[in-house]
Amino acid sequence: SAASDVYKRQGVHELPEGVLYSELQAGTGAQPKAGGKVQVRYVGKLPDGSVFDQNQTPQWFSLDSVIEGWQVALPKMHAGAKWRLVIPSAQAYGAEGAGDLIAPYTPLVFEIELLAVGD
């Protein structure tokens, strides 16, 4: 499609479920396994650019416990990589939203850096 051609020129790639990513920094380390653990540093933004969540200190997460958009993208990353993700609401918080911060049906933008991979 014309839109996906424009995306490719801008270095934006599409993953399953409509999750878009662009690589900000390449990684050469291990890739997470399904259900494994990941250590990440991230900033989460709403479509208007306002930050709704970020961690200054790297955090470990189990891939089973994160939003679907992360579950789609993180296993494709190598440790050391930093990606910008655009996640459709269906792969984020969907119709429910999240508290006062994220309205229902809101797509989310994350800059996520994969620091380390665990079992």
What are these regions (language model features)?
Residues 2-7:
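Short, small-residue-biased leader/transition segments that mark boundaries at the very start
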Residues 9-13:
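N-terminal beta-hairpin/loop module of FHA
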Residues 16-28, 33-51, 67-118:
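FKBP-type peptidyl-prolyl cis-trans isomerase
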Residues 52-68:
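Well-structured core secondary-structure elements of compact alpha/beta domains
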